[in-house]
Structures are given as C-alpha cells and as structure tokens.
Regions:
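Long, solvent-exposed N-terminal ectodomains/accessory regions
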Residues: 1-188, 192
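Acidic-and-aromatic substrate-binding clefts and catalytic sites of carbohydrate-active enzymes
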Residues: 10-15, 19-46, 51-64, 76-92, ...
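Surface-exposed flexible segments
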Residues: 49-52, 60-68, 102-148, 234-258, ...
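Non-catalytic propeptide/linker segments at domain boundaries
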Residues: 191-314
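Catalytic grooves of carbohydrate-active enzymes
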Residues: 212-230, 292-307, 314-316, 326, ...
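Acidic (Asp/Glu)-rich catalytic clusters
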Residues: 309-315, 330-353, 375-381, 464-467
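Core alpha/beta catalytic barrel or barrel-like domain that forms the active/cofactor pocket
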Residues: 347-357, 385-393
C-alpha cells in the first residue's frame, strides 16, 4: 500500500552524477552559475534521474546530504562528482537544445528565461556565461537583454503570459518568489523546467492590483486539482495573502522556492516492501484518563521541521512532525528517509490543512470534500492519525486571529471520522472542540527560534499559572530551526506537575476530561487582512 499514490516509475539508473553547491546565491556572484546549473539539471533529469545537487548543512533544506547517502545505500546508486560548470555542460549538453539569456539588471527576466528554458529545452545564462555555453555547441534560443528594461512587473508578466502561457503545464505552476533583489534562490527551478511550468512572482496584495489581476488569471486557467509550487515573493505580498488567494481557488501550495532536486527525487519510488509504520504510542480505540496535572505536547510543522531533523537532540523529547504528504507523489525517498531515521519519540502527522498547504476557511465548499478525501488517503498511506490545520488568512504573521469558523470545524469532523484528533494554529489560536472522542486543540504557545530559552521557560510557566484548572492541555508549536536540545532544559525548569507527551497520547487524554472551552472564530473577531 505504501506506493499506491506514487506515479508509476521505471527503475532509476544506477550510475548518476552529483554536484556540490555553496551558499552564494547573490545575483552579482554565485547566482548566474547556479541558475544555469539548475536549469541544466531539469533538462538532464527529464527522462532519467541523472543529476543530484548537494547543498551545505546550513542550507534551509539540510537533508540533501543525508538523502544523497540514502540513495546510495537503499537504491544502490553510484555517483560521479562533477566539480565544474564546464564539466557539467560537457556531460549534459546533449540534454539542451540551446540557451536563453536573462537580464541580470531585471530580476523577473530570470523567471521568463526559466519558462522559455522549460518549453524550448534550454539553459539560462547571463551575458557573462554565453562564451562557456557556446564553447559546448549550444545555440541561442532567446535573448531577454533589454526587452523588459524600465517595465513594471505587471508589464513584464503580461507580455510573458501572452507569449508562453498557452504552452505551459496547467496542472502545475511555479511561483518563483521568495528571495528577491540582491539575493535570489531558485533552487526549485529544476522541477519547473522538467515539468514545463510557467514561472512568475506576481503579487497577491490587493494594493498591487495590476499584478493581482494577472495572478488571478493564471489561477483561474489552471486545471481543477492543480498545485502551485514555490513560494510567495518576499517584500511584495505576505504569506497570508498568497495562501488565502490560492485557497479561494481550491489550489494546493507546495514550497519552498528553494526546495532542491525534485526533478531527481520524483523518479524514485519507495524501496520494495517498504510500508510506513508510525510510532503510535496509543491504540486508536484506547481510553485514557487524564490526571490533575499539566500535559504538554510539542509539534514541529514546516515540512518535518525545515532545518531541524538532522540536528543533535532529536529523540530526547516526544515530538510530532508535520509531514508534507504530497511528497508521496514527487519525493517518496525523502519520506522514506525520514521514517527510517525516526526515533521512537518522533511521531508523524498530516498537514498542512489538507493534501497541501491551504487555508481551510477559504476553500470553496464544493472542493473541500474532494481535497480532504485526497488528504485522508495520503494519511492512510503514511499511517498518520492526526491532522494539523492552519488558517492565517486573518492573522498577521505569527500573531493574531488563526481561528476556524464553526462550519470549517464541522467540515473537518465530517471528512476525518477516523482520526484521533486535530491540532490547529501556527501562532496561538483559540479554536477548541470535542466531538465523540476526537478533540480539536489549538496551540497555546509558539516558540520563536530567536526567543531566549529562559524567556520561553518563563512564558510557559506563566501559561501554566494562568490556566489553573487541571488537567491543562498545553499544545506548543515549535517553529522550524528550533532544535530539540534547546527545549530539554526548558522542560526541566517547568513548574509541575508537568508531563510531556507524544501527541497521540495527549489527544487521547484531552478527550477524557474537557477542561477547555468550545470556541470557534466569530464574524466580528478582529482580522489583520480583510481579504479579497
């Protein structure tokens, strides 16, 4: 059952190539070569899994080296390292039909070049890189230098839509936002090129109406069930605006813009005989009785805690980890790696909000059941019994209103009759409920990675004092890049009696004694972003 929802794949080749990147993504230095190489990677990996890129341990997606070792160990792949751009072009020049020149003075031109590269089988280059691609016999496909000088982003993408959109993939689109300006980090471009996606960074901010109308045009043209890959453009709009907009169309988001190697990862299935087995601490039909104490559970979201999994200390405390469930479709080996390397204290949960990152208060009612059925099937494959929900459409980053309307809660309870329960929020939220034996508990606390641990301890002790009714069920969201080691001392200094539990035991106990009030988002609750 473990591979039921993975596209049928032929056996990947056993002799592949690897490259190592550094952390220099500056437009003036490291970006041009990296952009060319990830475009070449997308072409080289279109028919075979030929090229894998390893990033440094302090890159945001820190698992590229462990996953590289996993491919060698579990799939029997032997890699030859390519150390130079020249050598990469020599090896893979047959995968490319030519090159597209982007204008380093006009940032959006890189996205246009990526779009053309996917459609025309090209690599993207700046003016300085033209000699090296010509040396390897590549011919010019298009030259964007000067084409978009002085134009607004809306003008640039309006032109690109007219020229290229009709030829692009309608099941997938690349929102290549994220870092902008002096630093750009398009590590996911290989995937967009392989899949012939349209690349853009159009704003979802109503204040930029000329861009928003184009953004909506693209979303409206996508097929039902489509996915947006990438991430919103920093400094132009907010994550809340972008995700709310996608959710209004019933479209899933899979990020980030710098998630590497999908063109390679998508070609591997789970290893023969592999089946997900989660670290359940309690049977689904078990009945537990809460005592007069404080129960705490820690949850890491953000795609299995971006940047945390390989750090020391994991396993010392019970932790739940939100899994990007759609990786069963385009990165199965990564999910198998996480499950293989999990400790008994690591517990996997579904999310975020469904079969992709979405804001459920805004999902169209006719799409909600279909999307949640997809999520339910993925959770079955992944042996997950808890769904994590997040809706920040009315919030301001990690603060503000992250609550769910009652009709949204109703829809979740109807869609997931067999889960142990639900966790809600990102920052603290107030939505809580209990129906039959399935609680919905919102986070009471959010641990910012930069907050000193003694202040985190003081905050949690204050919550324990303020919430004097026992048992008190304290769900804590541990933001990405917070390592487990840093929380061990926090737990040791909490004022008891306190027990840190795995999430499934926590929810079972929360079902036994409802000391929390049922609450949903109200129409007159304050909102930061009023919507569209």
């Amino acid at each position: 059952m473990g591979s039921a929802f993975v596209f049928a794949k032929k056996e990947p080749i056993k002799n592949a190539y690897s490259m190592r990147f550094d952390l220099d993504w500056e437009v003036a230095s490291g970006l041009p070569e990296k952009a060319m190489l990830v475009s070449l990677q997308g072409l080289a990996n279109r028919e075979e899994a030929q090229l894998y890129i390893i990033h440094p341990p302090d890159f945001q997606w820190e698992i590229t080296e462990p996953l590289f070792d996993f491919y060698k160990r579990k799939h029997g792949v032997s890699y030859t390292e390519i150390k130079t751009v020249d050598a990469a072009l020599e090896r893979f020049k047959s995968s490319a039909k030519g090159y597209v020149v982007w204008d380093a003075e006009v940032g959006p031109s890189l996205n246009i070049a990526f779009t053309i590269a996917g459609l025309e089988d090209g690599v993207v280059v700046t003016e300085a890189l033209i000699p090296i691609v010509q040396k390897h016999g590549l011919k010019p496909i298009d030259d964007l230098r000067g084409r978009y000088t002085g134009q607004s982003h809306a003008e640039i993408y309006s032109d690109a839509i007219k020229r290229y959109w009709h030829r692009c993939n309608r099941d997938k689109i690349m929102l290549m936002g994220g870092h902008r300006g002096r630093v750009m980090m398009p590590a996911m471009a290989d995937w967009g090129i392989r899949e012939r996606m349209f690349f853009h960074e159009l704003s979802a901010d109503p204040e930029e109406a000329d861009e928003l109308v184009l953004n909506r045009q693209l979303l409206e043209d996508l097929n039902v069930g489509a996915t947006v890959f990438g991430w919103h453009p920093y400094g132009k709009d907010t994550e809340e605006q972008s995700t709310m907009l996608l959710s209004m169309y019933g479209i899933k988001m899979e990020g980030l813009h710098n998630l590497p190697n999908l063109s390679y990862n998508c070609q591997f299935d789970f290893t023969p005989g592999f089946r997900f087995t989660n670290n359940h601490q309690v049977a689904k039909d078990a009945v537990l009785i809460a005592e007069e104490k404080v129960y705490i559970t820690f949850v890491q979201s953000d795609s299995v805690g971006i940047g945390v999994w390989t750090k020391p200390g994991r396993g010392k405390l019970p932790f739940a980890w939100q899994v990007t469930m759609n990786w069963t479709k385009f990165s199965p080996a990564a999910l198998e790696y996480f499950h293989e390397s999990a400790t008994p204290n690591d517990y996997f949960i579904g999310g975020l909000s469904g079969p992709g990152y979405m804001y459920p208060n805004n999902i169209p009612k006719d799409r909600f059941p279909v999307l949640m059925e997809e999520a339910k099937q993925l959770m079955t494959v992944l042996d997950e019994h808890v769904m994590e929900i997040m809706d920040n459409s009315a919030a301001d980053g990690n603060v503000g209103n992250a609550d769910l309307f009652e009709e949204t809660v109703d829809a979740y309870y109807e869609a997931f009759p067999d889960v142990l329960g639900f966790i809600n929020g990102y920052g603290p939220a107030r939505t809580r409920d209990l129906r039959d034996s399935r609680p919905m508990i919102s986070y009471d606390y959010y641990i910012d990675p930069k907050r000193p641990r003694d202040e985190v301890t003081a905050d949690l002790n204050e919550l324990i004092t303020l919430n004097s009714k026992r048992p008190y069920f304290l769900a804590v969201h541990v933001r990405e890049s917070n390592d487990v080691n840093s929380l061990v001392t926090v737990v040791e200094n909490l004022e008891g009696p306190v027990e840190v539990l795995a999430l499934d035991r926590f929810l079972k106990l929360a079902a036994s004694n409802k000391t929390y009030e049922t609450r949903f988002r109200k129409e007159d609750d304050p909102v930061h972003f009023k919507g569209y």
